Amino acid sequence: MAGLPRRIIKETQRLLAEPVPGIKAEPDESNARYFHVVIAGPQDSPFEGGTFKLELFLPEEYPMAAPKVRFMTKIYHPNVDKLGRICLDILKDKWSPALQIRTVLLSIQALLSAPNPDDPLANDVAEQWKSNEAQAIETARAWTRLYAMNNI
């Protein structure tokens, strides 16, 4: 971890020493700014039972700039597009250097528990969520079974 800002070293040490329940985040062996993340689908959500792989990258400007995060596992969610990009205010205009990797991961986990079709990234999924929520939830469960189980 030579040459890394002290803050990144401290955050990484804390993530490894005190993992967030349901979330595993490990720095890549060759690049300590790149994290392999696995989030367990939250209980009582359409994603329950799934394990979702994400990648998180800390740009040179971090913590003045937000981490770059995306889902690697396909997910049927109104706030995640086909490329795995996530619509989350703290990853964009609401980012603050006071926030940490841990906060970002908790916010993504919360987004799985409470999809927000009113601020969509995947418009087709959001429309389905608004017009027929039961059907959208069933599709999300089916995608979870298909793409997020037995995938680790």
Curated annotation (Swiss-Prot):
Metabolic or biological pathway, per its Swiss-Prot or TrEMBL entry: Protein modification; protein ubiquitination
Catalysed reactions, as listed in the record: S-ubiquitinyl-[E1 ubiquitin-activating enzyme]-L-cysteine + [E2 ubiquitin-conjugating enzyme]-L-cysteine = [E1 ubiquitin-activating enzyme]-L-cysteine + S-ubiquitinyl-[E2 ubiquitin-conjugating enzyme]-L-cysteine
Q: How is it modified after translation?
A: Conjugation to ISG15 impairs formation of the thioester bond with ubiquitin but not interaction with UBE2V2.
Q: Which residue positions are annotated as catalytic? A: C87 (glycyl thioester intermediate)
Give Gene Ontology CC terms. cytoplasm; cytosol; glutamatergic synapse; nucleus; postsynapse; protein-containing complex; UBC13-MMS2 complex; ubiquitin conjugating enzyme complex
Alphabetized, the UniProt keywords read: Acetylation, ATP-binding, DNA damage, DNA repair, Isopeptide bond, Nucleotide-binding, Phosphoprotein, Transferase, Ubl conjugation, Ubl conjugation pathway
Annotated positions of the Phosphoserine modification: S131
Activity modulation notes: Activity is inhibited by binding to OTUB1, which prevents 'Lys-63'-linked polyubiquitination. Activity is inhibited by GPS2, leading to prevent 'Lys-63'-linked polyubiquitination.
Which CDD domains does the entry link to? UBCc_UBE2N
What Pfam families does the entry give?
A: UQ_con (PF00179)
Gene Ontology molecular function: any one? ubiquitin-protein transferase activator activity
Task: Write the Enzyme Commission number(s) for this entry.
Answer: 2.3.2.23
**How is the quaternary structure described?**
Heterodimer with UBE2V2. Interacts (UBE2V2-UBE2N heterodimer) with the E3 ligase STUB1 (via the U-box domain); the complex has a specific 'Lys-63'-linked polyubiquitination activity. Interacts with RNF8 and RNF168. Interacts with RNF11. Interacts with the E3 ligases, HLTF and SHPRH; the interactions promote the 'Lys-63'-linked polyubiquitination of PCNA upon genotoxic stress and lead to DNA repair. Interacts with ARIH2 (via RING-type 2). Interacts with OTUB1; leading to inhibit E2-conjugating activity. Interacts with GPS2; leading to inhibit E2-conjugating activity.
This protein is called Ubiquitin-conjugating enzyme E2 N
Lineage start: Eukaryota, Metazoa, Chordata, Craniata, Vertebrata
Q: Which gene specifies this protein's sequence?
A: Ube2n
